[in-house]
Amino acid sequence: EFVAAFQERILNTHPSLLPAFGGSMHAVAQALEHGVKVTGCTIHLVTDQVDGGPILLQQCVEVFPDDDVETLHARIREHEHRLLPLAVRAFAEGRVRVEGRCARVIAS
């Protein structure tokens, strides 16, 4: 009910480049298990589909050969912490345009 009441007005962070490894609390572990060379983070709008809302911002993060879940997740979090305020600001300033499943952030 909460999500339905605020459809596409809630921001979420996810520790992968959605749609890869979406819907999981273990996205970083899955990235390592699959041997991806690049993962990252996504800031997206929340919809009734888990991790399926329009994507606002993404940032790539290189996966190093000696990474484990903790080291990789720490680097991803740094980017999430940088991107989330940018997304909140764009949203608050009315610079987010949603068309279907696609979102654009208009430059300030």
Where are these regions (language model features)?
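Donor/substrate-binding cores of folate-linked one-carbon enzymes
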Residues: 1-105
